[in-house]
């Protein structure tokens, strides 16, 4: 679905702090925006304190880097309805909208209201241990992964949807992905590509032993539970962030978040398939 445009009086610019190019590009964008809007702020994408200070009331947040910078921004703006515009300085950039060179001549047009809002579902996850919630509030735009803790070994899990078992797996891991995440980790293990604005969830096993490797597509309102078998050790990874250790009997619950990511798009909706085709080398530029 397409959401309404947000107030453009306050705009933020973030950048990947380990990239000198991203820092320079963000500074140039910030300088260009200053005479155009009431307030513009600049921060490292890793500076959580700056985001907490500035994000309220921000209408647009430009991210300079790659998809990882966009993923971090999508989590950082929760619970505020901030629209994201990704400036691609990375490699593939499924989530980014345009290059720095393409952005600069269009900044005034963007501030003036050009484009449309694309709304994308996010995931929320929690950890249950001995029947008690031990960690909640994980949010992911791409995916939640329950994986093996040790290279060379598998992890044995039971996967349930809405409390009904759908499979026992001994595998490298289980990916629960959004439509956005369908072009990320799950794609690399043979999962399908979903339209970015669909709300379905994907469950995809990673290298399952003596079990089907097919993905399962679930309605957006589904609850997914992944339980670690007794005597097993695993990890929880949310959008590729630092892992959390899991042990036998631990359960990871995943559902669609009440928060959604908003992206500013300047091309028609069909551009998604063109972008995917080109970045996966299915189409020539």
Language-model features: locations:
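Gly/Ser-rich helix-loop-strand patches that form or flank binding pockets
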Residues: 72, 76-87
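ATP/NTP phosphate-donor binding region
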Residues: 1-60, 64, 101-116, 127-138
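Short glycine/serine/threonine-rich phosphate/pyrophosphate-binding segments
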Residues: 22, 68-73, 182-188
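ATP/nucleoside-binding phosphotransfer catalytic cores, i.e., glycine-rich phosphate-binding loops
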Residues: 146, 162-165, 212-285
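Short, well-ordered beta-strand core segments
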Residues: 61, 84, 174-175
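Gly/Ser/Thr-rich active-site loops/lids in small-molecule metabolic enzymes
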Residues: 164-212
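Catalytic core of DAGKc-family lipid kinases
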Residues: 92-172
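A residue-level signal for conserved active-site and pocket-lining positions in enzyme catalytic cores
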Residues: 16, 62, 66, 88, ...
């Amino acid at each position: 679905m397409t959401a309404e445009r947000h107030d453009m009086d306050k705009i933020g610019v973030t950048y990947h702090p380990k990239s000198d190019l991203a820092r320079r590009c963000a500074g140039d964008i910030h300088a260009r925006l200053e005479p155009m809007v009431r307030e513009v702020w600049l921060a490292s994408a890793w500076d959580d304190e700056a985001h907490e200070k500035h994000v309220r009331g921000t209408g647009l947040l430009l991210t300079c880097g790659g998809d990882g910078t966009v993923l971090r921004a999508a989590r950082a703006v929760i619970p505020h309805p901030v629209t994201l515009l990704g400036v691609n300085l990375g490699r593939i950039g499924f989530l980014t909208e345009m290059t720095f060179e393409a952005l600069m001549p269009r900044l005034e047009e963007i501030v003036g209201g050009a484009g449309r809002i694309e709304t994308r579902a996010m995931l929320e996850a929690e950890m249950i241990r001995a029947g008690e919630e031990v960690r909640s509030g994980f949010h992911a735009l791409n995916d939640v992964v329950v994986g093996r803790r040790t290279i060379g070994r598998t992890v044995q899990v039971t996967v349930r949807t809405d409390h009904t078992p759908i499979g026992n797996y001994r595998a490298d891991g289980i990916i629960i992905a959004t439509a956005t995440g369908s072009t990320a980790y799950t794609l690399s293990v043979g999962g399908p590509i979903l339209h970015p604005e669909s709300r379905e969830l994907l469950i995809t096993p990673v290298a399952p032993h003596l079990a089907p490797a097919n993905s399962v597509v679930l309605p957006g309102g589904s609850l997914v539970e992944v339980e670690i078998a007794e005597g097993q050790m695993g990890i929880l990874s949310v959008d590729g962030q630092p892992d959390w250790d899991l042990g036998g009997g631990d359960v990871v619950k995943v559902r669609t978040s009440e928060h959604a990511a908003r992206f500013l798009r300047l091309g028609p909706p069909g551009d998604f398939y063109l972008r995917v085709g080109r970045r996966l080398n299915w189409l020539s530029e």
